[in-house]
Amino acid sequence: MLGKVNGVQIECLESMVINSREIYGKFMIEPLSYGQAITVGNALRRVLLSDVPGVTIVSVRIAGINHEFSTVKGVKEDVLEILLNLKNIVLKGNVLKNQIGRLKVQGPAIVTSGQIEFPLDITVVDPCQYIATISGNDYLEMELKVEKSSGYKLVETFSKKSPLDFLPIDSIFMPVKKVNYYVEEILDSKVAYEKLILELWTNGSLSPQQSINYASDNLVKLFNPLRVLDFSKESSSVYEQNSLIKQKLIEELCLSVRAYNCLKRVQVDSIGDLLEYSIGDLLEIKNFGQKSVEEVSKALYKKFGVKLKH
C-alpha cells in the first residue's frame, strides 16, 4: 500500500522494469463513490501524458555541418538519421536551466549515448542507445543543448531561439509513454463503491510512482485556488457598477434629436429608465422606428457595455 487518506487508499499491484527504457506500474485506488473513479482516472491520465516534465535534447551543433540535409565525412548515417537517433535518447536529471552536452569520438567506432559528456545533474538512462557509426579515422564532434519541459515541441518552436549553427530537433518531453485505466465495482458493499485500476508505462527516466505523485500534486495545485475565491466581493462590485450606470442620464448617449425626443416624451430620463424597455417596447413608442432602436442599442453598448432586453 502506498498510502491512505480520508478512507481512500492507493496500492501498487505490480511494478516491473521491462528494460532500461520502459518501466511498468499498476495501481489500485479505492473505495471511490459511484462515478468518481472515471473522473479521477480521466484527470490523472491527461496530466500524466501531457504535464509530467522530462529532459531531452532540443538542438545539436555538428562540427562542419550547417544544415540537416548534409552528410558527415566518414559517418555511415546522414545528418537526418543522426538527429532522429538523438531525439530518441532518454535523459533524466534536475535541470533548472538549459545545459550543454559534448561528444567527440574518433573512428572507426560505434557511437552511443553513453559517450556523451553531460553536466553532473544529467544522466543517460540507456548508455547503449545508438547514435552513429564512424567507418574511417574521422571524428564525429557535437554539442547538444538540453532542456526540461513538458509535452511535445516541434522544430518550429526552437528554430527562432536557437543559434544558426544549432540544428533543432522535434522534442518529446513526456516521460510517461502510455496510460490505461478501468473501473471495477466493489461488490461486497451495501453502498455503491468503485475501484480505479491505473496502468502506466514510463521511459525509464521516472518511475510510475514518481509520475503519479507529480500528476496528483499538479491537480491539487490546479484546484486549490478555487477553494479561496471570494465571489461575494466580485458580485458586490458588479452590483455597484450596474447601479451607477442606471443613474446616468440618457444625454450621455449622445443620441439623435429624433430618438432623444421620443424617449423624453415617454419620461425616459436615465439609463435605468431605458433598460426597463425591451426592443419590442421601444418599437411601440410613437415615431421610434428600427433605426432609432439600432442607434440606442449601439450607443448603450459602446458607452456602458450593456444591451437592451429582447
From Swiss-Prot:
<dbReference type="InterPro" id="IPR011263">
    <property type="entry name" value="DNA-dir_RNA_pol_RpoA/D/Rpb3"/>
</dbReference>
<keyword id="KW-0548">Nucleotidyltransferase</keyword>
<keyword id="KW-0804">Transcription</keyword>
<dbReference type="InterPro" id="IPR011260">
    <property type="entry name" value="RNAP_asu_C"/>
</dbReference>
<dbReference type="GO" id="GO:0005739">
    <property type="term" value="C:mitochondrion"/>
</dbReference>
<dbReference type="Pfam" id="PF01193">
    <property type="entry name" value="RNA_pol_L"/>
</dbReference>
<dbReference type="InterPro" id="IPR036603">
    <property type="entry name" value="RBP11-like"/>
</dbReference>
<feature type="region of interest" description="Alpha N-terminal domain (alpha-NTD)">
    <location>
        <begin position="1"/>
        <end position="230"/>
    </location>
</feature>
<dbReference type="InterPro" id="IPR036643">
    <property type="entry name" value="RNApol_insert_sf"/>
</dbReference>
<keyword id="KW-0150">Chloroplast</keyword>
<keyword id="KW-0240">DNA-directed RNA polymerase</keyword>
<comment type="subunit">
    <text>In plastids the minimal PEP RNA polymerase catalytic core is composed of four subunits: alpha, beta, beta', and beta''. When a (nuclear-encoded) sigma factor is associated with the core the holoenzyme is formed, which can initiate transcription.</text>
</comment>
<dbReference type="Pfam" id="PF03118">
    <property type="entry name" value="RNA_pol_A_CTD"/>
</dbReference>
<keyword id="KW-0934">Plastid</keyword>
<dbReference type="GO" id="GO:0003899">
    <property type="term" value="F:DNA-directed RNA polymerase activity"/>
</dbReference>
<dbReference type="GO" id="GO:0009507">
    <property type="term" value="C:chloroplast"/>
</dbReference>
<protein>
    <recommendedName>
        <fullName>DNA-directed RNA polymerase subunit alpha</fullName>
        <ecNumber>2.7.7.6</ecNumber>
    </recommendedName>
</protein>
<feature type="region of interest" description="Alpha C-terminal domain (alpha-CTD)">
    <location>
        <begin position="242"/>
        <end position="310"/>
    </location>
</feature>
<dbReference type="GO" id="GO:0006351">
    <property type="term" value="P:DNA-templated transcription"/>
</dbReference>
<dbReference type="InterPro" id="IPR011773">
    <property type="entry name" value="DNA-dir_RpoA"/>
</dbReference>
<comment type="function">
    <text>DNA-dependent RNA polymerase catalyzes the transcription of DNA into RNA using the four ribonucleoside triphosphates as substrates.</text>
</comment>
<dbReference type="Pfam" id="PF01000">
    <property type="entry name" value="RNA_pol_A_bac"/>
</dbReference>
<comment type="similarity">
    <text>Belongs to the RNA polymerase alpha chain family.</text>
</comment>
<dbReference type="GO" id="GO:0000428">
    <property type="term" value="C:DNA-directed RNA polymerase complex"/>
</dbReference>
<dbReference type="GO" id="GO:0003677">
    <property type="term" value="F:DNA binding"/>
</dbReference>
<dbReference type="InterPro" id="IPR011262">
    <property type="entry name" value="DNA-dir_RNA_pol_insert"/>
</dbReference>
<keyword id="KW-0808">Transferase</keyword>
<dbReference type="GO" id="GO:0046983">
    <property type="term" value="F:protein dimerization activity"/>
</dbReference>
